């Protein structure tokens, strides 16, 4: 048995106060290995459009509104000689069948620190009815960009799951996805790469309506030097803030509530029978809240390494609270918020405030042990896992656990899924690589207070030695080279898809 203290899905987070300290005191980031100060007077700005949503009508953005999320190389390193134009506004052109307009709009910074060269920004502007074409304007040049309409399928709660990479943790997924379904939430999971059999399992759950897989493409600036815009080493945690903001915008008009969780963070309702009822109850008591904030409580858990023997009941039976808390995550009413960072928004509307929840916590599966043998599931008594506060309260009742187990068994009996369960990974090879890397390259500095030694954090810190017997599905897309424009050159990708031909990597 080997304990897993952190997984690829686990997002290493810098507390906001620490990040601002870094910004003020150190402003440190790495421009790439062996690079020199840029010997030019001006560094050109490169913006990759990760999201562009057009709303014919929005309760918070207005009519005919465009919402943009971009990754842009706005941060300058201390040893950099170049200046960049840093324009205060974006210029956007739009056309419909009868007319066209050109408008200017400011952008808001989402990333609250200068640790990475490339940061996330958000912008919104009202355009024309029935827009057919949207173009970004740079000087006298136009760049047409693809845009989408937000989801119109009404849902009470959407869980936005942080981007997964080289993911093997199928037990975490099953634990989370069945709980979300039971309490009336839909998982929208952002995926970079995963073990092939795990990907196939998620696809089957997607077909059954439990969740949606969202391909999360890498930011790339084709034919641009890393000195100018380093999209490999200089983006924070696989662009997680952009992913969460994308999810917020995608379900802005269709979901009552949206929450942002890692795969090993599972929020279980305690104050009401469903997520929506609990969130509504908390929001009503704090009418001026822009979001509610749940802390995370760490738990140990054991799970079989063999897919055909998997049991949710046995996972619940093994849960033990570590009595150790970590910074949590938020739940938002999407009408009140337009963008968010990893933990919470860098800014909140002045008339609104956050509400810190004291009546419930996120169950964080901090340490998972993969075991060879488990008790016989059919004869095993259900043990209700205790709530973290040493009271007699339990996280779930016996009846609720029984219902979750029945739901799992029904899925496992489906012929296609039954075959996949037999093929799920029984070792955590890439998990160990990333855990050791993160501990050596990030955590030892973070937890020892050696903040000045931290460079832009994320999976790019790690090496991914390929295993000859393990294959992965990895996201790819079509990227486009662009003519350099001033003040900003705009880039984008289209046709996102998964392929088995690119290996097991985080980018």
Curated annotation (Swiss-Prot):
The organism's place on the tree of life at top rank:
Eukaryota
Query: Any one cellular component term from GO for this entry?
Result: membrane
Report TM segments: 9-29
Transmembrane as a keyword?
yes
Which major enzyme category is it? transferase
Q: Can you name one GO molecular function term for this protein?
A: glycosyltransferase activity
Q: Where in the cell is it found?
A: Membrane
Domain GT92 residue range list: 155-444
Major subcellular site: membrane
InterPro entries (UniProt xref): Glyco_transf_92, GTase_92
EC number, UniProt record: 2.4.1.-
Q: What protein am I looking at?
A: Glycosyltransferase family 92 protein F49C12.5
Specify the species: Caenorhabditis elegans
């Amino acid at each position: 048995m080997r304990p897993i203290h952190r997984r690829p899905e686990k997002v290493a987070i810098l507390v906001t106060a620490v990040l601002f300290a870094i910004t003020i005191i150190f402003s440190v980031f790495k421009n790439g290995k062996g690079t020199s100060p840029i010997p030019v007077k001006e560094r050109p700005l490169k913006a990759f459009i990760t999201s562009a949503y057009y709303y014919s009508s929005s309760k918070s953005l207005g009519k005919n509104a465009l919402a943009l999320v971009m990754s842009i190389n706005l941060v300058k390193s201390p040893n950099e000689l170049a200046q960049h134009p840093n324009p205060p506004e974006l210029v956007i052109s739009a056309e419909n069948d009868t007319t066209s307009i050109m408008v200017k709009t400011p952008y808001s910074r989402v990333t609250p620190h200068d640790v990475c060269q490339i940061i996330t920004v958000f912008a919104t502007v009202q355009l024309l009815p029935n827009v057919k074409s949207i173009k970004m304007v740079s000087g006298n040049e136009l760049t047409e960009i693809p845009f989408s309409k937000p989801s119109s399928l009404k849902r009470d709660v959407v869980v936005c799951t942080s981007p997964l990479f080289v993911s093997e943790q199928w037990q975490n997924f099953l634990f989370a996805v069945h709980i979300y379904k039971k309490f009336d939430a839909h998982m929208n999971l952002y995926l970079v790469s995963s073990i092939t059999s795990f990907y196939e399992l998620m696809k089957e759950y997607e077909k059954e309506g439990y969740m949606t897989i969202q391909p999360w493409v890498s930011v790339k600036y084709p034919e641009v030097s890393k000195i100018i815009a380093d999209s490999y080493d200089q983006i924070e945690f696989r662009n997680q803030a952009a992913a969460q903001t994308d999810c917020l915008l995608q379900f802005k008009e269709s979901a009552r509530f949206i929450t942002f969780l890692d795969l090993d963070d599972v929020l279980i309702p305690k104050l009401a029978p469903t997520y929506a009822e609990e969130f509504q109850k908390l929001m009503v008591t704090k009418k001026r809240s822009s979001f509610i904030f749940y802390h995370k409580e760490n738990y140990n858990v054991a799970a079989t390494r063999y897919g055909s023997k998997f049991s949710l009941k046995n996972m619940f039976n093994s849960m033990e609270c570590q009595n150790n808390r970590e910074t949590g995550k938020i739940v938002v009413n999407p009408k009140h918020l337009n963008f968010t960072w990893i933990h919470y928004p860098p800014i909140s509307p002045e008339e609104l405030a956050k509400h810190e929840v004291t009546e419930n916590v996120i169950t964080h599966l901090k340490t998972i042990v993969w075991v060879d043998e488990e008790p016989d599931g059919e004869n095993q008594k259900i043990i209700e896992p205790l709530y973290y506060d040493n009271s007699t309260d339990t996280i779930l009742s016996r009846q609720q656990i029984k219902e979750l187990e029945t739901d799992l068994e029904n899925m496992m009996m489906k012929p296609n899924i039954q075959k996949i369960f037999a093929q799920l990974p029984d070792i955590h090879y890439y998990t160990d690589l990333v855990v050791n890397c993160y501990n050596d390259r990030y955590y030892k500095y973070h937890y020892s207070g050696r903040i000045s030694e931290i460079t832009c954090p994320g999976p790019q810190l790690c090496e991914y030695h390929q295993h000859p017997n393990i294959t992965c599905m990895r996201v790819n897309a079509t990227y486009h080279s662009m003519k350099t424009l001033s003040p900003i050159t705009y880039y984008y990708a289209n046709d996102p898809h998964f392929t088995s031909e690119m290996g097991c990597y985080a980018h």
